[in-house]
Amino acid sequence: MSVILLLLNSIGFIVPVLLAVALLTLIERKVLGYMQLRKGPNIVGPYGLLQPIADGFKLIIKETLKPSNASPYLFYLSPVLFFFLSILLWSIIPVINSTLNFNLSLILILGLSSLSVYSLLGSGWSSNSNYSFLGGVRAVAQTISYEISLGLILLSVVVFSGGFNIGLISSVQNECWLAVCCFPLFSIWFISTLAETNRAPFDLTEGESSNSFQGTMLNIPGGPFALFFIAEYANIIFMNLFSVLLFLGGGSPVNLLFPINIISVIFKTVALVVLFLWIRASYPRFRYDQLMYLTWKKYLPLSLGLLIFFKFLLSLNKDYLQDY
């Protein structure tokens, strides 16, 4: 019976994630269209609402072709692993009932997000293409570089909240959000999440010019590409939801009023997602050396300095140290 309940719980959060990804693809094209003074998708269904279904059907019916010199197993295993890790991250978020809700959930999220680089590198290497391999190396270097800054920012959040549990971190922000109290920390976190999810202006791994078109997914056919695509957009929604829980107080100021607290979380997440799209429509792509310069010479020293500064300020409060 417990296995059946666990299976139903898993399906209960997988289906909404897939629906949210489909809706995000439509919202992205609509928002970018209106920002560029055009309508976006408006043919398939009323007002283009069925466009995600048409896109998914198109990818599914495409023939799955494998390059003749590609690795026979890793070529198909990498997209599945990337999709599985992306969906597994959602089981930790305690929105209603978390499948894996425990005290060290922050560490688990950081570890699972780090594992995705293996699927990206494996996908680039297994296709036996120089362009795909270079795109995979770029993706790995970018992800690892910005994860260091994200890890230091998470340590600062832990210092403020006194624990590694996501529910605890959200509950301590009832009076003041960390995004307000520590705005420099939140700004570094938000920009780093753009780089972590390979979004503009940090989407160098999927450059649309001749430098590395589609990057590691250059030779990926329709079905496996759909897994990469779904996982990438699921990561975008997840990182914004994670930002809401860490810095915007989750469902506060109505944490105890169900379902208003869920609506509050969804509203904040959608606002951050639209901000992602707004940045994509407004800013040009960084050069790769500028991307690395930003994280290693700007964000890493700044996030480390803020961590030491916040720890020093809180160490002056002896009552806090006793509770901690």
Swiss-Prot record:
Regions that span the bilayer: 3-23, 76-96, 102-122, 148-168, 175-195, 227-247, 256-276, 294-314
GO biological process: aerobic respiration
Catalyses which reaction(s): a ubiquinone + NADH + 5 H(+)(in) = a ubiquinol + NAD(+) + 4 H(+)(out)
UniProt subcellular location: Mitochondrion inner membrane
A molecular function (GO) term: NADH dehydrogenase (ubiquinone) activity
Enzyme Commission numbers on file: 7.1.1.2
InterPro entries: NADH_UbQ_OxRdtase_su1/FPO, NADH_UbQ_OxRdtase_su1_CS
Membrane topology classification: Multi-pass membrane protein
UniProt main location, coarse: mitochondrion
An annotated GO cellular component: mitochondrial inner membrane
Keywords: Electron transport, Membrane, Mitochondrion, Mitochondrion inner membrane, NAD, Respiratory chain, Translocase, Transmembrane, Transmembrane helix, Transport, Ubiquinone
Short name of any one Pfam family annotated for the protein: NADHdh
Function: Core subunit of the mitochondrial membrane respiratory chain NADH dehydrogenase (Complex I) that is believed to belong to the minimal assembly required for catalysis. Complex I functions in the transfer of electrons from NADH to the respiratory chain. The immediate electron acceptor for the enzyme is believed to be ubiquinone.
Family, similarity comment: Belongs to the complex I subunit 1 family.
Descriptive protein name: NADH-ubiquinone oxidoreductase chain 1
Source organism per UniProt: Pisaster ochraceus
Taxonomic path: Eukaryota, Metazoa, Echinodermata, Eleutherozoa, Asterozoa
